[in-house]
Amino acid sequence: MSAEQPAETASAGNPLADRITTADGSKPEGTTETTDNEQADGAAAQLGGSELNEPDYTVEVKLSDLQADPNNPLYSVKSFEDLGLDPRILQGLSAMNFRKPSKIQERALPLLLNNPPKNLVGQSQSGTGKTAAFVLNALSRLDLSTEQAQKTPQALILAPTRELARQIVGVIQCMGQFLDGLNVSTAVPADTNSRHSKIESSVVVGTPGTVMDMIRKRVMVANKLKVLVLDEADNMLDQQGLGDQCIRVKALLPKDIQVVLFSATFPTHVHQYASKFAPQANELTLQHEELTVEGIKQLYLDCSDEEDKYKTLVQLYGLLTVASSIIFVKTRASAAEIEKRMVAEGHTVASLTGGIEGSQRDAVIDQFRAGQAKVLITTNVLARGIDVSTVSMVINYDIPELHQPGAPERQADFQTYLHRIGRTGRFGRVGVSISFVSNREEWNMLNQIQQYFNCTIQRVDTKDWDEVEDIIKKTIKNTRAQAQFGR
């Protein structure tokens, strides 16, 4: 268990910056300022999050009580005040500049807050306010009336990665800043040789494996838990290992616990599984054709081979100046090689892969949020959920693919592609996604992506770098640039 810093300081520079590398070995400088003009999701505005995205979409409600009318005014709300919330939570919402519920929140909050508690399965794209919805529900169900209650876990939120867990903690601390006695703990993999101490907090945010281990070792008491939330639920229920861990965690919890599942995507087979994990649940769904990522110009670069990919990447960054960007790679070895080459060219970069210890990972993401590293090289650790408002370019150095041993051909991972490029152009901003293609198999996967999303990914000729520079710079400047995909 690791205690989090107060929300006000969560995005400040972290002294543990040994994974931030500059060409001359010096400490990087510069920070980015964020504004809190609008409601934000997933990170709070105070933590560098992006503004809420409110496109024209409708929210479909399916109630577990088939006799009930989902259009009844009881199942919709137009103001936070109408929900009968604790005034201190309303004060926290006001401090976060939450003026009114988002469309998802309008429908989700009455269902979540109703008593007796009912399970909820919500499918909602990033930037629609789902994080705030499940956090508000969790805070509303806490009993903080005694010191003992304040030290007893009552709400458990599971996330697939350490980074997303820390981001959720920041939202909880911002929203609950006026709740006396609110303590939040993280249950994430500890650094080498460190031991988890007993959790004495009312809210716990963590990863499934660590939470399961803590409960079994009695480091965390689970018999008073009232709410279980899975964020990025499709990823956790579908991914080998994580799904089993989630089931084992749930088996250790009270039978009457309220289960809340939220994710941007729910493939059919995962949705069927989710219905068993959260039985008799109310359901919220965005119409599938409305699931779009707006403001992202999709491009691809032809490279002759793997070595040419390295050279092309270095040349690309030699041309461009962007606020922040993320490079997604398949392996840790590729991440290390790219980091070495880019540092040699004078770029300030950070590398974040699964092999990095916990405190170092925290330092890397904090420095990237603060703008002290402009380029982040990562595997799929950051493909989901993480919100850094300054990211305007994502590089698919390796196209995401499904792990299918023995398959006749390589298969693109559509959901990971969608989540990856969703790191840029977030919530109405403009961004660029560039995929690298160096052989026929990679071209086939890129073509699969175009067919699946019914979109066109524009080829950029690397023989004409003036054209490359012109296209990308114009795209970033053009606030109307959009690429939409739906299915």
Curated annotation (Swiss-Prot):
| Keywords carried by this UniProt record | ATP-binding, Cytoplasm, Helicase, Hydrolase, Membrane, mRNA transport, Nuclear pore complex, Nucleotide-binding, Nucleus, Protein transport, RNA-binding, Translocation, Transport
GO BP term, example: translational termination
Query: Which GO terms fall under molecular function for this chain's record?
Result: ATP binding; ATP hydrolysis activity; inositol hexakisphosphate binding; RNA binding; RNA helicase activity
What Gene3D superfamilies does this protein map onto?
Answer: P-loop containing nucleotide triphosphate hydrolases
**How is the protein disposed in the membrane?**
Peripheral membrane protein
Span of the annotated motif Q motif:
78-106
SUPFAM superfamilies given in the database record: P-loop containing nucleoside triphosphate hydrolases (SSF52540)
Q: Which Gene Ontology cellular component terms are annotated?
A: cellular bud tip; cytoplasmic stress granule; nuclear membrane; nuclear pore cytoplasmic filaments
* Record flagged with keyword Protein transport: yes
- Helicase C-terminal domain location is 295-468
The annotated region (Disordered) lies at 1-53
- InterPro entries in alphabetical order: DEAD/DEAH_box_helicase_dom, Helicase_ATP-bd, Helicase_C-like, P-loop_NTPase, RNA-helicase_DEAD-box_CS, RNA_helicase_DEAD_Q_motif
- By its UniProt entry, which PROSITE patterns does this protein fall under? DEAD_ATP_HELICASE, HELICASE_ATP_BIND_1, HELICASE_CTER, Q_MOTIF
The main location is cytoplasm
Q: Which domain of life is it from?
A: Eukaryota
User: What family does this chain come from, according to its entry?
Assistant: Belongs to the DEAD box helicase family. DDX19/DBP5 subfamily.
Q: What's this protein's function?
A: ATP-dependent RNA helicase associated with the nuclear pore complex and essential for mRNA export from the nucleus. May participate in a terminal step of mRNA export through the removal of proteins that accompany mRNA through the nucleopore complex. May also be involved in early transcription.
Record note on domains? The Q motif is unique to and characteristic of the DEAD box family of RNA helicases and controls ATP binding and hydrolysis.
Subunit field text? Associates with the nuclear pore complex.
Protein's name according to its UniProt entry: ATP-dependent RNA helicase dbp5
